[in-house]
From Swiss-Prot:
Alphabetical keyword list: Aspartyl protease, Cell membrane, Glycoprotein, GPI-anchor, Hydrolase, Lipoprotein, Membrane, Protease, Signal, Virulence
UniProt-recorded name of the protein: Probable aspartic-type endopeptidase CTSD
Highest taxon above the source species: Eukaryota
EC number: 3.4.23.-
Family: Belongs to the peptidase A1 family.
List of catalytic residues: D120, D302
InterPro entries: Aspartic_peptidase_A1, Aspartic_peptidase_AS, Pepsin-like_dom, PEPTIDASE_A1, Peptidase_aspartic_dom_sf
Species: Trichophyton verrucosum (strain HKI 0517)
Membrane topology: Lipid-anchor; GPI-anchor
Places the protein is found: Cell membrane
Protein backbone atom coordinates (compact mmCIF):
# COMPACT_ATOMS: atom_id res chain seq x y z
CA UNK A 1 0.00 0.00 0.00
CA UNK A 2 1.31 3.40 -0.92
CA UNK A 3 0.80 6.40 1.30
CA UNK A 4 1.12 10.13 1.08
CA UNK A 5 2.24 11.45 4.42
CA UNK A 6 1.39 15.04 5.09
CA UNK A 7 3.30 16.41 8.03
CA UNK A 8 3.29 19.86 9.56
CA UNK A 9 6.80 20.74 10.52
CA UNK A 10 8.04 23.50 12.77
CA UNK A 11 11.48 25.02 12.54
CA UNK A 12 12.48 26.53 15.83
CA UNK A 13 15.05 28.95 17.13
CA UNK A 14 14.89 30.95 20.33
CA UNK A 15 12.66 33.41 18.51
CA UNK A 16 10.37 30.95 16.75
CA UNK A 17 8.29 27.95 17.76
CA UNK A 18 5.58 25.93 16.06
CA UNK A 19 3.16 23.06 16.45
CA UNK A 20 3.16 19.57 15.05
CA UNK A 21 0.42 17.89 13.03
CA UNK A 22 0.46 14.58 11.16
CA UNK A 23 -1.86 13.71 8.29
CA UNK A 24 -1.67 10.22 6.72
CA UNK A 25 -3.57 10.22 3.42
CA UNK A 26 -4.09 7.04 1.41
CA UNK A 27 -3.39 7.06 -2.29
CA UNK A 28 -4.62 7.24 -5.01
CA UNK A 29 -7.10 9.75 -3.58
CA UNK A 30 -4.59 12.54 -4.15
CA UNK A 31 -6.76 15.17 -5.83
CA UNK A 32 -7.90 16.72 -2.56
CA UNK A 33 -6.19 19.91 -1.48
CA UNK A 34 -3.35 19.29 0.91
CA UNK A 35 -2.42 22.87 1.72
CA UNK A 36 -2.37 23.15 5.49
CA UNK A 37 -4.28 25.86 7.29
CA UNK A 38 -1.70 25.84 10.03
CA UNK A 39 0.83 28.64 10.25
CA UNK A 40 4.60 28.45 10.52
CA UNK A 41 6.24 25.62 8.63
CA UNK A 42 4.69 22.86 6.56
CA UNK A 43 6.29 19.57 5.51
CA UNK A 44 4.76 16.99 3.21
CA UNK A 45 6.28 13.57 2.56
CA UNK A 46 5.71 11.40 -0.51
CA UNK A 47 6.36 7.69 0.00
CA UNK A 48 6.33 5.31 -2.95
CA UNK A 49 8.23 2.44 -4.61
CA UNK A 50 11.28 3.31 -6.70
CA UNK A 51 10.17 5.46 -9.60
CA UNK A 52 13.27 5.22 -11.72
CA UNK A 53 13.05 3.13 -14.88
CA UNK A 54 15.72 0.47 -14.35
CA UNK A 55 16.08 -0.12 -18.09
CA UNK A 56 16.76 3.59 -18.41
CA UNK A 57 20.38 3.20 -17.35
CA UNK A 58 20.80 -0.54 -17.61
CA UNK A 59 23.48 -1.66 -15.20
CA UNK A 60 24.92 1.45 -13.63
CA UNK A 61 28.45 1.20 -12.29
CA UNK A 62 29.02 3.61 -9.46
CA UNK A 63 32.06 4.56 -7.46
CA UNK A 64 31.83 3.59 -3.81
CA UNK A 65 33.89 5.93 -1.66
CA UNK A 66 35.51 4.19 1.28
CA UNK A 67 37.59 6.08 3.79
CA UNK A 68 39.27 5.29 7.10
CA UNK A 69 36.98 4.57 10.03
CA UNK A 70 37.49 8.02 11.49
CA UNK A 71 36.47 9.59 8.19
CA UNK A 72 33.31 7.64 7.36
CA UNK A 73 31.93 4.99 9.61
CA UNK A 74 29.52 2.63 7.87
CA UNK A 75 28.02 5.20 5.55
CA UNK A 76 29.59 4.09 2.27
CA UNK A 77 27.13 5.59 -0.16
CA UNK A 78 27.21 4.94 -3.91
CA UNK A 79 27.46 7.90 -6.24
CA UNK A 80 28.33 9.04 -9.71
CA UNK A 81 31.22 11.38 -8.97
CA UNK A 82 31.66 14.61 -10.90
CA UNK A 83 35.01 15.29 -12.55
CA UNK A 84 37.38 17.53 -10.56
CA UNK A 85 36.69 21.20 -11.36
CA UNK A 86 39.33 23.24 -13.15
CA UNK A 87 37.74 26.68 -12.87
CA UNK A 88 38.05 28.83 -9.75
CA UNK A 89 35.20 28.98 -7.25
CA UNK A 90 33.63 25.85 -8.72
CA UNK A 91 32.41 22.82 -6.79
CA UNK A 92 31.59 19.45 -8.33
CA UNK A 93 28.01 18.25 -7.97
CA UNK A 94 27.68 14.47 -7.80
CA UNK A 95 24.53 12.40 -8.06
CA UNK A 96 23.34 9.09 -6.69
CA UNK A 97 23.63 7.37 -10.07
CA UNK A 98 19.87 7.52 -10.60
CA UNK A 99 19.39 11.28 -10.99
CA UNK A 100 17.36 11.62 -7.80
CA UNK A 101 19.71 13.67 -5.60
CA UNK A 102 22.63 16.04 -6.12
CA UNK A 103 25.28 16.83 -3.51
CA UNK A 104 28.81 18.15 -3.02
CA UNK A 105 31.69 17.83 -0.58
CA UNK A 106 32.14 20.67 1.90
CA UNK A 107 34.96 20.80 4.46
CA UNK A 108 33.94 22.05 7.89
CA UNK A 109 36.07 23.35 10.78
CA UNK A 110 39.79 23.87 11.31
CA UNK A 111 40.56 20.23 10.47
CA UNK A 112 38.46 20.17 7.30
CA UNK A 113 35.94 17.50 8.25
CA UNK A 114 34.41 16.28 4.97
CA UNK A 115 30.63 16.45 4.79
CA UNK A 116 28.35 15.49 1.91
CA UNK A 117 25.94 18.42 1.53
CA UNK A 118 22.74 18.46 -0.49
CA UNK A 119 22.88 21.42 -2.91
CA UNK A 120 19.55 23.14 -2.44
CA UNK A 121 18.31 26.24 -4.22
CA UNK A 122 15.03 25.87 -2.32
CA UNK A 123 16.55 26.44 1.12
CA UNK A 124 18.59 29.26 2.61
CA UNK A 125 19.61 27.55 5.87
CA UNK A 126 22.60 25.23 6.25
CA UNK A 127 23.02 22.41 8.78
CA UNK A 128 25.07 19.27 9.53
CA UNK A 129 24.81 16.26 11.82
CA UNK A 130 26.58 17.06 15.12
CA UNK A 131 29.19 14.75 16.66
CA UNK A 132 27.31 14.77 19.97
CA UNK A 133 24.40 13.06 18.27
CA UNK A 134 23.86 9.50 19.52
CA UNK A 135 20.92 8.73 17.24
CA UNK A 136 21.26 5.79 14.86
CA UNK A 137 20.95 8.08 11.87
CA UNK A 138 24.00 10.08 12.94
CA UNK A 139 25.99 6.85 13.14
CA UNK A 140 25.41 6.36 9.44
CA UNK A 141 26.72 9.76 8.46
CA UNK A 142 29.71 11.99 8.91
CA UNK A 143 29.27 14.24 11.91
CA UNK A 144 30.96 17.41 13.09
CA UNK A 145 31.67 18.82 16.55
CA UNK A 146 34.16 20.15 19.10
CA UNK A 147 36.62 17.29 18.65
CA UNK A 148 36.75 17.99 14.92
CA UNK A 149 37.70 21.65 15.10
CA UNK A 150 39.72 24.07 17.20
CA UNK A 151 37.71 27.03 15.95
CA UNK A 152 34.12 25.93 16.54
CA UNK A 153 31.95 28.22 18.66
CA UNK A 154 28.81 26.66 20.06
CA UNK A 155 25.96 29.05 20.83
CA UNK A 156 23.02 28.52 23.17
CA UNK A 157 20.57 29.31 20.37
CA UNK A 158 18.24 26.37 19.88
CA UNK A 159 17.68 25.02 16.41
CA UNK A 160 15.51 22.21 15.17
CA UNK A 161 13.27 20.71 12.54
CA UNK A 162 10.32 18.61 13.70
CA UNK A 163 8.22 16.41 11.43
CA UNK A 164 5.79 13.47 11.53
CA UNK A 165 7.74 10.61 13.04
CA UNK A 166 10.78 12.35 14.42
CA UNK A 167 13.03 15.35 14.25
CA UNK A 168 16.46 16.85 13.82
CA UNK A 169 17.38 19.30 16.55
CA UNK A 170 20.36 20.92 18.22
CA UNK A 171 21.96 24.34 18.39
CA UNK A 172 23.46 26.95 16.12
CA UNK A 173 27.26 26.83 15.89
CA UNK A 174 29.80 29.04 14.15
CA UNK A 175 32.83 27.73 12.30
CA UNK A 176 34.65 27.62 9.01
CA UNK A 177 33.19 26.04 5.89
CA UNK A 178 35.51 25.49 2.95
CA UNK A 179 34.21 24.87 -0.57
CA UNK A 180 34.87 26.00 -4.14
CA UNK A 181 38.04 27.83 -3.07
CA UNK A 182 36.32 29.79 -0.31
CA UNK A 183 36.97 29.63 3.43
CA UNK A 184 34.06 31.19 5.23
CA UNK A 185 33.17 31.57 8.91
CA UNK A 186 29.42 31.06 9.08
CA UNK A 187 26.62 30.07 11.46
CA UNK A 188 24.88 26.76 10.78
CA UNK A 189 22.72 24.22 12.54
CA UNK A 190 24.32 21.31 14.40
CA UNK A 191 21.92 18.40 14.90
CA UNK A 192 22.37 16.61 18.24
CA UNK A 193 19.36 14.36 17.72
CA UNK A 194 17.93 12.85 14.56
CA UNK A 195 15.07 10.48 13.93
CA UNK A 196 15.57 7.05 12.39
CA UNK A 197 14.08 8.44 9.19
CA UNK A 198 17.51 9.90 8.51
CA UNK A 199 19.01 6.41 8.38
CA UNK A 200 17.95 6.52 4.74
CA UNK A 201 19.11 10.02 3.93
CA UNK A 202 22.34 10.14 1.90
CA UNK A 203 23.51 13.58 2.95
CA UNK A 204 25.38 14.72 6.05
CA UNK A 205 23.61 18.06 5.88
CA UNK A 206 22.17 20.70 3.58
CA UNK A 207 23.93 23.63 1.91
CA UNK A 208 21.15 26.15 1.40
CA UNK A 209 21.67 28.55 -1.49
CA UNK A 210 18.16 29.90 -1.79
CA UNK A 211 17.27 33.56 -1.29
CA UNK A 212 16.84 34.66 2.30
CA UNK A 213 13.84 36.33 3.87
CA UNK A 214 14.91 39.98 4.31
CA UNK A 215 13.58 39.88 7.88
CA UNK A 216 15.91 37.04 8.88
CA UNK A 217 18.40 37.88 11.63
CA UNK A 218 21.12 35.37 10.69
CA UNK A 219 23.01 35.67 7.37
CA UNK A 220 23.11 32.74 4.99
CA UNK A 221 26.23 31.27 3.41
CA UNK A 222 25.57 33.11 0.16
CA UNK A 223 24.88 36.39 1.95
CA UNK A 224 28.23 36.13 3.73
CA UNK A 225 30.03 35.48 0.45
CA UNK A 226 28.43 38.61 -0.97
CA UNK A 227 28.96 40.77 2.12
CA UNK A 228 32.65 39.92 2.16
CA UNK A 229 32.87 40.65 -1.58
CA UNK A 230 34.30 37.21 -2.28
CA UNK A 231 32.32 36.72 -5.48
CA UNK A 232 33.28 38.08 -8.89
CA UNK A 233 29.56 38.60 -9.46
CA UNK A 234 26.67 37.80 -7.16
CA UNK A 235 25.43 34.90 -9.24
CA UNK A 236 25.51 31.11 -8.97
CA UNK A 237 25.56 28.85 -12.03
CA UNK A 238 24.45 25.21 -11.82
CA UNK A 239 24.43 22.25 -14.17
CA UNK A 240 23.25 18.84 -13.04
CA UNK A 241 24.76 15.74 -14.64
CA UNK A 242 22.50 13.03 -16.06
CA UNK A 243 23.50 9.52 -14.99
CA UNK A 244 22.01 7.85 -18.08
CA UNK A 245 24.35 9.91 -20.28
CA UNK A 246 27.37 8.88 -18.23
CA UNK A 247 28.00 12.57 -17.65
CA UNK A 248 30.38 13.62 -14.87
CA UNK A 249 30.37 17.37 -15.40
CA UNK A 250 27.94 18.37 -12.67
CA UNK A 251 29.05 21.57 -10.99
CA UNK A 252 28.08 24.72 -9.15
CA UNK A 253 30.03 27.90 -9.86
CA UNK A 254 29.95 30.69 -7.31
CA UNK A 255 30.27 34.17 -8.78
CA UNK A 256 30.50 33.22 -12.45
CA UNK A 257 28.78 31.46 -15.35
CA UNK A 258 30.17 28.52 -17.34
CA UNK A 259 29.41 29.20 -20.99
CA UNK A 260 30.66 25.76 -22.04
CA UNK A 261 27.73 24.07 -20.32
CA UNK A 262 24.93 25.46 -22.48
CA UNK A 263 24.02 26.43 -26.03
CA UNK A 264 22.49 29.71 -27.12
CA UNK A 265 22.06 32.55 -24.67
CA UNK A 266 20.78 32.71 -21.14
CA UNK A 267 17.24 34.04 -20.88
CA UNK A 268 16.43 35.63 -17.53
CA UNK A 269 13.10 35.78 -15.71
CA UNK A 270 12.57 37.98 -12.68
CA UNK A 271 11.54 36.38 -9.42
CA UNK A 272 7.87 37.09 -8.65
CA UNK A 273 7.17 40.08 -6.36
CA UNK A 274 7.96 39.57 -2.68
CA UNK A 275 9.18 36.06 -3.46
CA UNK A 276 11.59 34.59 -0.93
CA UNK A 277 12.43 31.68 -3.21
CA UNK A 278 13.47 31.27 -6.84
CA UNK A 279 9.92 31.44 -8.18
CA UNK A 280 9.43 32.69 -11.73
CA UNK A 281 6.60 33.06 -14.22
CA UNK A 282 6.09 30.28 -16.78
CA UNK A 283 4.43 30.72 -20.17
CA UNK A 284 2.99 27.34 -21.12
CA UNK A 285 3.67 23.64 -21.68
CA UNK A 286 3.87 22.35 -25.25
CA UNK A 287 3.42 18.66 -26.13
CA UNK A 288 4.19 17.40 -29.64
CA UNK A 289 3.89 20.97 -30.84
CA UNK A 290 0.48 21.59 -29.24
CA UNK A 291 0.07 24.30 -26.59
CA UNK A 292 -1.80 23.17 -23.47
CA UNK A 293 -2.71 26.78 -22.69
CA UNK A 294 -1.38 26.46 -19.13
CA UNK A 295 -1.14 30.20 -18.68
CA UNK A 296 -0.44 32.10 -15.49
CA UNK A 297 1.62 29.36 -13.84
CA UNK A 298 4.71 30.03 -11.77
CA UNK A 299 7.47 27.61 -10.91
CA UNK A 300 9.84 27.33 -7.94
CA UNK A 301 13.22 26.36 -9.39
CA UNK A 302 14.51 23.84 -6.87
CA UNK A 303 17.59 21.64 -7.28
CA UNK A 304 16.57 19.78 -4.13
CA UNK A 305 13.38 18.33 -5.66
CA UNK A 306 13.63 15.26 -7.88
CA UNK A 307 10.37 15.57 -9.82
CA UNK A 308 8.13 17.99 -11.64
CA UNK A 309 5.32 18.46 -9.10
CA UNK A 310 2.21 20.37 -10.11
CA UNK A 311 -1.49 20.70 -9.27
CA UNK A 312 -3.54 17.56 -10.11
CA UNK A 313 -5.63 19.31 -12.77
CA UNK A 314 -2.49 20.32 -14.65
CA UNK A 315 -1.05 16.81 -14.31
CA UNK A 316 -4.32 15.36 -15.61
CA UNK A 317 -4.18 17.58 -18.68
CA UNK A 318 -0.56 16.71 -19.41
CA UNK A 319 -1.13 12.98 -19.15
CA UNK A 320 -4.26 13.19 -21.30
CA UNK A 321 -1.87 14.08 -24.12
CA UNK A 322 0.24 10.94 -23.61
CA UNK A 323 -1.20 7.86 -25.35
CA UNK A 324 -2.14 5.08 -22.91
CA UNK A 325 -1.25 7.13 -19.84
CA UNK A 326 -3.37 6.17 -16.84
CA UNK A 327 -3.92 7.48 -13.35
CA UNK A 328 -2.41 4.65 -11.36
CA UNK A 329 -2.25 3.94 -7.64
CA UNK A 330 -0.94 7.31 -6.54
CA UNK A 331 1.06 8.12 -9.66
CA UNK A 332 0.34 8.29 -13.34
CA UNK A 333 1.62 5.45 -15.44
CA UNK A 334 2.56 5.55 -19.11
CA UNK A 335 4.16 3.26 -21.67
CA UNK A 336 7.88 2.87 -21.01
CA UNK A 337 8.43 3.55 -24.71
CA UNK A 338 6.82 7.01 -24.47
CA UNK A 339 8.61 9.59 -26.62
CA UNK A 340 6.14 12.48 -26.47
CA UNK A 341 7.98 15.75 -27.03
CA UNK A 342 7.46 17.95 -23.97
CA UNK A 343 8.66 21.53 -23.80
CA UNK A 344 8.27 23.93 -20.89
CA UNK A 345 8.10 27.54 -22.04
CA UNK A 346 9.72 30.10 -19.75
CA UNK A 347 10.67 33.64 -20.66
CA UNK A 348 9.63 33.16 -24.29
CA UNK A 349 11.82 30.09 -24.81
CA UNK A 350 10.74 26.45 -25.02
CA UNK A 351 13.00 24.05 -23.10
CA UNK A 352 12.81 20.34 -23.92
CA UNK A 353 12.23 17.82 -21.12
CA UNK A 354 13.76 14.56 -22.31
CA UNK A 355 11.60 11.39 -22.11
CA UNK A 356 14.46 9.78 -20.15
CA UNK A 357 13.79 12.37 -17.46
CA UNK A 358 10.00 12.12 -17.13
CA UNK A 359 9.57 8.35 -17.71
CA UNK A 360 10.25 6.48 -14.48
CA UNK A 361 10.64 2.84 -13.50
CA UNK A 362 8.70 -0.08 -14.89
CA UNK A 363 5.68 -1.14 -12.84
CA UNK A 364 4.47 -4.69 -12.21
CA UNK A 365 2.83 -4.48 -15.64
CA UNK A 366 5.45 -5.16 -18.29
CA UNK A 367 6.01 -2.20 -20.57
CA UNK A 368 4.27 0.24 -18.21
CA UNK A 369 6.29 2.82 -16.30
CA UNK A 370 5.58 5.44 -13.66
CA UNK A 371 5.52 9.07 -14.70
CA UNK A 372 7.86 11.46 -12.90
CA UNK A 373 5.46 14.31 -13.59
CA UNK A 374 3.56 14.18 -10.32
CA UNK A 375 0.17 15.71 -9.55
CA UNK A 376 -0.07 16.98 -5.96
CA UNK A 377 -1.82 20.04 -4.54
CA UNK A 378 1.06 21.04 -2.27
CA UNK A 379 1.42 24.65 -3.40
CA UNK A 380 -1.02 27.20 -4.78
CA UNK A 381 -3.50 26.35 -7.56
CA UNK A 382 -1.13 27.67 -10.24
CA UNK A 383 2.25 27.00 -8.63
CA UNK A 384 4.60 24.26 -9.78
CA UNK A 385 7.64 22.80 -8.08
CA UNK A 386 10.19 22.57 -10.89
CA UNK A 387 12.81 20.04 -9.87
CA UNK A 388 15.51 17.91 -11.44
CA UNK A 389 13.25 16.30 -14.06
CA UNK A 390 13.43 19.70 -15.75
CA UNK A 391 16.73 21.04 -14.42
CA UNK A 392 18.83 18.26 -15.95
CA UNK A 393 17.88 19.74 -19.31
CA UNK A 394 19.08 23.28 -18.66
CA UNK A 395 21.91 25.32 -17.25
CA UNK A 396 20.49 27.53 -14.51
CA UNK A 397 21.78 30.81 -13.12
CA UNK A 398 20.60 32.39 -9.87
CA UNK A 399 21.23 36.13 -9.80
CA UNK A 400 21.07 37.53 -6.26
CA UNK A 401 21.62 41.18 -7.22
CA UNK A 402 18.91 41.36 -9.86
CA UNK A 403 16.64 38.79 -8.21
CA UNK A 404 16.20 36.68 -11.31
CA UNK A 405 16.78 33.19 -12.72
CA UNK A 406 18.53 32.54 -16.03
CA UNK A 407 18.05 29.40 -18.13
CA UNK A 408 19.68 28.01 -21.26
CA UNK A 409 19.58 24.63 -22.99
CA UNK A 410 22.08 22.27 -21.34
CA UNK A 411 24.98 20.75 -23.30
CA UNK A 412 25.85 17.08 -22.86
CA UNK A 413 29.15 15.99 -24.37
CA UNK A 414 28.67 13.18 -26.87
CA UNK A 415 24.88 13.23 -26.66
CA UNK A 416 23.24 12.60 -30.04
CA UNK A 417 20.02 14.34 -29.10
CA UNK A 418 20.83 16.98 -26.48
CA UNK A 419 18.11 19.03 -24.80
CA UNK A 420 17.03 21.88 -27.06
CA UNK A 421 15.37 25.23 -26.69
CA UNK A 422 13.33 27.10 -29.32
CA UNK A 423 11.54 30.45 -29.26
CA UNK A 424 7.88 30.24 -28.27
CA UNK A 425 5.20 32.34 -30.01
CA UNK A 426 4.68 34.52 -26.97
CA UNK A 427 4.68 34.62 -23.21
CA UNK A 428 2.23 35.27 -20.43
CA UNK A 429 3.58 36.79 -17.23
CA UNK A 430 1.96 36.65 -13.82
CA UNK A 431 2.87 38.26 -10.53
CA UNK A 432 2.44 35.39 -8.10
CA UNK A 433 1.80 35.66 -4.38
CA UNK A 434 4.41 34.64 -1.82
CA UNK A 435 4.65 30.86 -1.72
CA UNK A 436 6.57 28.36 0.41
CA UNK A 437 10.29 27.90 0.43
CA UNK A 438 11.09 24.44 -0.71
CA UNK A 439 13.75 21.89 -0.06
CA UNK A 440 13.64 18.23 -0.73
CA UNK A 441 15.60 15.15 0.19
CA UNK A 442 15.16 11.63 -1.05
CA UNK A 443 16.02 8.25 0.35
CA UNK A 444 17.47 5.31 -1.58
CA UNK A 445 17.64 1.81 -0.17
CA UNK A 446 20.58 0.19 -1.97
CA UNK A 447 22.93 -2.68 -1.27
CA UNK A 448 26.33 -1.08 -1.96
CA UNK A 449 28.05 -4.40 -2.63
CA UNK A 450 25.71 -6.28 -4.97
CA UNK A 451 22.76 -5.94 -7.29
CA UNK A 452 20.51 -7.90 -4.94
CA UNK A 453 17.79 -6.14 -3.05
CA UNK A 454 18.71 -5.81 0.63
CA UNK A 455 16.24 -6.43 3.41
CA UNK A 456 17.42 -3.56 5.58
CA UNK A 457 20.17 -1.06 6.17
CA UNK A 458 20.91 2.33 4.75
CA UNK A 459 21.08 3.77 1.26
CA UNK A 460 23.82 5.60 -0.46
CA UNK A 461 25.76 8.62 -1.69
CA UNK A 462 29.12 10.56 -1.52
CA UNK A 463 30.77 13.51 -3.35
CA UNK A 464 33.79 15.11 -5.04
CA UNK A 465 34.21 17.81 -7.76
CA UNK A 466 33.67 19.15 -11.37
CA UNK A 467 34.55 21.66 -14.39
CA UNK A 468 35.29 25.06 -15.92
CA UNK A 469 33.76 28.52 -16.09
CA UNK A 470 33.49 31.56 -18.33
CA UNK A 471 31.07 34.42 -18.65
CA UNK A 472 28.62 34.96 -21.49
CA UNK A 473 26.02 37.29 -22.94
CA UNK A 474 22.53 37.47 -21.55
CA UNK A 475 18.94 38.38 -22.32
CA UNK A 476 16.09 39.10 -19.95
CA UNK A 477 12.39 38.34 -19.80
CA UNK A 478 10.25 38.19 -16.70
CA UNK A 479 7.86 39.57 -14.17
CA UNK A 480 8.01 43.31 -13.94
CA UNK A 481 8.78 43.77 -10.27
CA UNK A 482 10.79 43.56 -7.90
CA UNK A 483 39.65 8.13 -0.54
CA UNK A 484 39.98 4.90 -2.31
CA UNK A 485 37.10 3.85 -4.49
CA UNK A 486 35.72 0.65 -5.94
CA UNK A 487 32.79 -0.19 -8.17
CA UNK A 488 29.54 -2.10 -7.86
CA UNK A 489 26.49 -2.67 -10.01
CA UNK A 490 23.55 -1.24 -8.10
CA UNK A 491 19.80 -1.38 -8.43
CA UNK A 492 17.48 0.81 -6.34
CA UNK A 493 14.97 -1.27 -4.44
CA UNK A 494 12.75 1.53 -3.15
CA UNK A 495 12.70 5.25 -2.93
CA UNK A 496 11.18 7.76 -0.60
CA UNK A 497 11.05 11.39 -1.61
CA UNK A 498 10.52 13.97 1.09
CA UNK A 499 9.48 17.38 -0.14
CA UNK A 500 9.72 20.10 2.50
CA UNK A 501 7.86 23.37 2.46
CA UNK A 502 8.65 26.24 4.79
CA UNK A 503 5.88 28.83 4.94
CA UNK A 504 6.18 32.38 6.16
CA UNK A 505 9.25 32.09 8.39
CA UNK A 506 12.86 31.30 7.80
CA UNK A 507 14.70 28.57 9.64
CA UNK A 508 17.18 31.29 10.55
CA UNK A 509 14.79 34.08 11.50
Amino acid sequence: MQFLWLCLLSAVTLQFTGTLAFYPIKLPDFTKGLVSNHGSIDRRFFTFPGLYKHAHTGSTTLNIRRGPSNYRRDNNYPAQIASPPTAPNTLGINNDGYDFSYFSEVKVGSEGQKMWMLIDTGASGTWVFGSDCTSKACGRHNTFGKEDSKTIKVTDEKWGVTYGTGKVSGVIVNDTMSFAGFELVTPFGSASTASDDFLNYPMDGILGIGPQDPNAKTPTVVQLLMQQKLLKSNVIGINLQRASEGATDGQITFGDIDKSKFSGELIYSNVVPDGYQWEIAMDDLIMDGKSLNLKGRTGIIDTGTSFLILPPADADLIHSMIPQANKGSGFYTLPCSTKVDIKLSIGGVEYTIQPDDYVGNETATKGTCNSLIVGRQILGPKQWLVGDVFLKNVYSVFDFDKNRVGLAARKYAGTKNPPSSTPSPGMFLLHAILCPKTISVLMLHIDPTSNKAPSGGSPGLPAESGSDSTTNGEATNGATSSPNSSSSVLTPTWLTLAVFFAIGSSLWS
